[in-house]
Amino acid sequence: MRSWKFSVAIVGLATGLLLSTSNIPPVHADGRRERACSVKTLNGSYGFYRNGTTSTGPLAALGILFFDGNGSVFGSQSISRNGVFTFDVPIPPGPYEVAADCTAKFLTDTGVEVARVLIVDGGNEIYLFSESTGNAVYGVGKKIHTADDDR
């Protein structure tokens, strides 16, 4: 009789422990949960470079992009195309889209996709490649300031 009561107590204790631990949220190594991206993830100024080849030869560029956090980006860049330099070339305002998986697209005002983008490190860095026909151009951008710091 005594061992039966002891067995019931052990089973009850084990059941209670199992039920109480089933509501513990998952633990992540960095202490943060997975985060989704949105247009707000790209917010502020980013220094960038681009490198690769175009239908007219090699391309290298560096510049600055300003993201408003609401889906619009503009900037300026200096470019070397096949060894011919052009400085302070404006990048006109255009829309960008961001998916929850932190992939993004740069678009023209008419909606034509011109670049694919991957947002990394919580929006502190971006990787991109050109989708212009004849181009094999990639780039990297790093956050300089948030939009609040740019004002």
Identify the residue ranges that each predicted region occupies.
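Bacterial N-terminal signal peptides
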Residues: 9-20
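Mature soluble binding/inhibitory domains
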Residues: 8, 23-151
